[in-house]
Design a protein with these regions (language model features):
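Residues that define the transmembrane beta-barrel architecture of outer-membrane proteins
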Residues: 5-9, 42-44, 110-116, 162, ...
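Residues on the lipid-exposed face of transmembrane beta-strands in outer-membrane beta-barrel proteins
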Residues: 11-15, 25, 48-52, 118-122, ...
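Outer-membrane beta-barrel translocator domains and adjoining extracellular loop/strand segments
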Residues: 36-42, 72-78, 132-135, 179-185, ...
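Outer-membrane beta-barrel translocator/channel fold
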Residues: 34-45, 49-112, 282
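Outer-membrane beta-barrel translocator/receptor signature
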Residues: 1-37, 41-44
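Membrane-embedded beta-strand positions of outer-membrane beta-barrel proteins
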Residues: 25, 50, 59-61, 166-170, ...
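Transmembrane beta-strand segments that form the barrel wall of outer-membrane beta-barrel proteins
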Residues: 1, 23-35, 242-243, 268-281
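Repeated loop/turn-to-beta-strand initiation elements of outer-membrane beta-barrel proteins
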Residues: 20-23, 56-61, 126-130, 176-177, ...
Length: 282
């Protein structure tokens, strides 16, 4: 429907390069036309992601972008276009929803946000040997009509046992809202500070958060029944607002220390206890 319908394009892709590395992307675009003039809405989301899972080094990362634009019409100019259409244009014109005059043109609200998230860790530990006994009845070992028992094979392999992890997590995010109108009727708003027939207003929020931690991992020996993690986090926030003269900027700092005690392995009991305390005022 090219008059008031909706359209959507959506795509997702993910691939494993090998047993350690993977990456992909996603796209989602939605467009709606609306039933009245200047009422269309569009929404666009897109992102890329990747991961690397090795014995010692592990990483996950994602970037996402979100954009939403909503055209505004301020409502119809006169309710009689709907309640008493015969009174409009001296009854010489029939109105449809897409031809009814509206209050605003070239006016929109736009929200745009993106974030980058990265978490990675480096694990220290030791290598130990594991022994596997291959069953003599395995298809690889079976010999038809053989009456002599075969000896079982013993396979010795090495596995990495992590003991301690050094962790870093980072998130960068920016969100912006913008209202713009290039064509307004005079007196549209009670208070006009700059221009009575045009508007331009925006608000921006920006933040960077870093978390550094060290973890003693669960299960590296029979006495390590739970994992213990200690961390420190710092977050920087910046806000930009418009006022009557210029843009005003506000900065904030947040600093926290915390810890986690968790048991995630086994079948009998699982628990997760977290605690943190702020040590810096905003």
């Amino acid at each position: 429907n090219k008059v008031n319908g909706e359209e959507r394009l959506k795509s997702y892709f993910s691939v494993n390069v090998n047993k350690r590395l993977a990456f992909g992307f996603n796209i989602d675009y939605l467009y709606g036309r609306g039933y009245y003039q200047n009422q269309s809405t569009s929404n666009f989301n897109a992102g890329i992601f990747a991961s690397y899972i090795g014995n010692k080094y592990q990483m996950q990362a994602v970037y996402n972008n979100f954009t939403m634009k909503m055209n505004e019409n301020g409502g119809i100019q006169d309710d009689r276009y709907i309640t008493r259409p015969e009174d409009m244009a001296e009854g010489k014109k029939e109105y449809e929803s897409t031809t009814i005059p509206v209050k605003l043109e070239q006016t929109s609200n736009k929200n745009k946000d993106f974030y980058v998230y990265l978490t990675h860790r480096y694990r220290l530990g030791f290598t130990r040997e594991t022994t596997t006994v291959e069953d003599a009845k395995s298809p690889k070992r079976a010999v038809a009509n053989d009456s002599v028992p075969l000896a079982k094979d013993t396979i010795i392999t090495e596995e990495f046992v992590p003991v301690t992890s050094f962790i870093h997590t980072m998130k960068v995010e920016r969100a912006r809202h913008k209202f713009s109108s290039a064509k307004e009727t005079e007196g549209q708003y009670p208070n006009a500070y700059f221009n009575e027939v045009a508007s331009r207003d925006s608000t921006t929020a920006f933040s960077v958060k870093n978390v550094f931690g060290i973890a003693l991992l669960e299960g590296f020996n029979k006495y390590a029944k739970a994992g213990l993690t200690a961390y420190i986090s710092h977050k920087f926030n910046r806000y930009e607002l418009m006022d009557t003269l210029s843009r005003t900027r506000f900065d904030e700092q947040e600093l926290f220390v915390g810890g986690e005690l968790a048991k995630r392995q086994g079948k009998t009991l699982h628990y997760n206890v977290n605690g943190e305390i702020g040590i810096m005022d905003k």
